[in-house]
Design a protein with these regions (language model features):
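Extracytoplasmic low-complexity segments
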Residues: 302-365, 533-549
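Short, aromatic/His-centered strand-loop micro-motif at the edge of beta-sheets
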Residues: 433-458
């Protein structure tokens, strides 16, 4: 108000009609919501205007829309709507979203009329279609306005203008008298509105190029519509099962109007190697009407290179947790320490795996677990920023509860989850999650129907700066494109073994794991398929070496000298220790 000389809240009577302006909370630098003073002013002036100007529209102007609007509700608020809905004669004009008025969702009538007035400086694109926020910058070339005419019979005509190109947009909106809600035209769901137009029409055959093991690129012709196509639904279909294996939405670029491109291209990802697919594309308009699909010719993704059995298993250089009968240690070269929170978790020797494991068992605990705090450790943060591998060997005794065996997923980061209930795809199964591209990527290791309680699974996922790959028990199972990694900040920079991290190590952890964890590792590179196979082979080979159990008896008997105990624990904690090395050590002990 100090710049305009105007008050924050105004009631204006002009030409025989009432006008009310409400500013957002003047005491908040960031919120676009309304304060109690403004809402009280609105309620009082609406009540007075409804009496003084009976049977006439009441014009209300404010910055932010309601959460109930069909276009930009994400940026809306609830408080004003509760007042306006008592007055069907209200016509509420708002901005805030920067969404185009060319879209018919910019007018909506329910208990009152709402109108989005469009962008005056630059345009935004709905994040319903671009959740990664990678929509193009409008470059100040999409600017709009409305001119409102009041007819002699009090009908309201709203003329839509493209102010950058100095021309009208589409046909005007008409709000007919009487203004008591009986003449609402733009009401209900978009699919059932009376102004709904015909469905889009697609043509041409989509072209598939740049085929890889996990995806391809697709180019297709833009479709046709009475108004415009809002977006396209791109689906990759497995031709053998007819299952949809991948779906993405692609914005049509309609907002460029005369400069809209004739063709669009997009990547398709998350496909299975050596599998036949076809691509199906449908056009979708603002009323959510879908066209008939156009389909590509079938194509086959590339096969993975054969696993090389001569490739050695890599060593985890950032985090490599091993357990003794009393503690957890990080034997990776990074030097990051493992910290026991509370009492940690019970540790015991697993006679099937032939190694020590932590045993959260059937209850788990958000107070007792192990953690690796990497805040301020550039070896770790630089190590994962361009690519990494997360690895865990675990089993759960509870195949219903949400739980995390190895995780750093507080607001960002990556980790393993089981039955995580907030993010699609949902289901009682093990998943890998990575925060990147403005969203959580979540990929399942197996179907929920395939998960067995008290069964060990070797779970591993990699990210190479562009692609996430999942491996289950040494074999590839799934992939997805991820171009940008988002890591936790501040005190949330720590990894939990047996739970998920929180905002700070001083807070209780989250979603305690209910089962056992034998291996917890992080690498500063994306290991390849041959290395994954070798890592899993190490585990299965170890489980067949009975001499580890003999070694454990010697280590826990208390009969070994300090020198022999140190040597023995080094053998126990090395996943690659061979039967021959154990035989030699046992012979050495027995000869003393």
């Amino acid at each position: 108000s100090q710049y305009t000389g105007q008050s924050f809240y105004q009631y204006i009577e002009k030409g025989g009609y009432p006008f009310i302006t409400i500013s957002v909370n003047p005491n908040s630098a960031w919120s676009a919501d309304y304060n109690d003073e403004g809402l009280e002013f609105l309620a009082n002036k609406l009540k007075a205007a409804a009496i003084t100007y009976k049977d006439k529209p009441i014009f209300v102007f404010s910055h932010s829309p309601s959460k109930r609007t069909p276009w930009g509700a994400k940026w809306g608020y609830d408080k004003m709507d509760k007042i306006l809905k008592e007055y069907p004669q209200v016509i509420h004009f708002t901005g805030h979203t920067h969404y185009t008025i060319e879209d018919e969702r910019s007018i909506w009538q329910n208990e009152y009329t709402w109108i989005n007035v469009g962008p005056s400086h630059y345009a935004n694109i709905s994040t319903d279609i671009t959740p990664d926020y990678e929509y193009p910058d409008s470059g100040k070339k999409i600017t709009e306005a409305v001119i409102v005419d009041i007819e002699e019979n009090t009908d309201i005509k709203v003329n839509r203008l493209d102010t950058y190109n100095e021309k009208e947009l589409k046909t005007p909106w008409l709000i007919k008298a009487p203004h008591n809600g009986s003449q609402f035209k733009y009401f209900g769901d978009m699919q059932t509105r009376t102004d709904k137009d015909a469905s889009p029409v697609m043509n041409g055959t989509p072209q598939v190029t740049d085929i890889t093991e996990y995806g391809c690129n697709i180019t297709f012709n833009q479709g046709e519509d009475d108004s415009f196509i809002w977006h396209y639904k791109v689906e990759a279909i497995d031709t053998r099962t007819q299952e949809i294996k991948y779906t993405r939405l692609v914005l049509s670029d309609f907002y460029w109007r005369n400069g809209t491109p004739e063709t669009l291209s997009c990547p398709v990802s998350g496909l299975t190697p050596d599998t036949e697919y076809k691509i199906s594309i449908k056009g979708v308009d603002s009323f959510f009407s879908e066209s008939q699909p156009v389909e590509s010719t079938t194509f086959k993704t590339n096969a993975l290179p054969p696993v090389d059995p001569s490739v050695k298993a890599p060593k985890a250089d950032l985090v490599d947790i091993v357990f003794t009968n009393t503690e957890a240690q990080n034997v990776a070269a990074s030097g990051l320490a493992v910290t026991k929170k509370g009492t940690g978790t019970p540790i015991g020797y697993n006679t099937d795996l032939k190694m020590y494991v932590i045993k959260p068992n059937t209850t788990g605990s958000i107070s007792n677990y192990y953690m690796v705090d990497y805040k301020g450790n550039t070896t770790y943060t630089n190590g994962v920023k361009n690519g990494f591998t997360y690895e865990v060997y675990c089993k759960t005794s509870d195949i219903k509860t949400m739980q995390y065996p190895l995780s750093n997923l507080q607001s960002a980061g990556m980790g393993f989850t089981f039955n995580e209930t907030y993010t699609d795809p949902k289901g009682a199964t093990f998943s890998a999650m990575i925060r990147g591209d403005g969203k959580y990527h979540k990929l399942n290791f197996m179907k929920a129907t395939d998960v067995k309680a008290n069964t060990y699974y070797h779970l591993l996922f990699t990210w190479n700066g562009e692609q996430i790959c999942l491996y289950l028990d040494g074999e590839f199972v799934a992939s997805d494109v991820c171009k940008k990694l988002t890591m936790p900040s501040g005190d949330a920079q720590y990894i939990c073994i047996g739970a998920d991290s929180n905002s700070s190590p001083s807070s209780a952890a989250q979603n305690a794991f209910k089962g056992e964890v034998a291996i917890a590792r992080v690498y500063s590179k994306a290991v390849n398929a041959s290395e994954v196979a070798s890592l899993y082979k190490q585990l299965t080979t170890r489980s067949t070496i009975a001499e580890f159990t003999t070694l454990n008896s010697l280590l826990t008997s208390g009969s070994l000298s300090q020198e022999l105990a140190t040597e023995g624990w080094a053998l126990m904690n090395n996943i690659a220790t061979s039967k021959e090395e154990l035989d030699a050590f046992i012979t050495k002990v027995n000869s003393k």
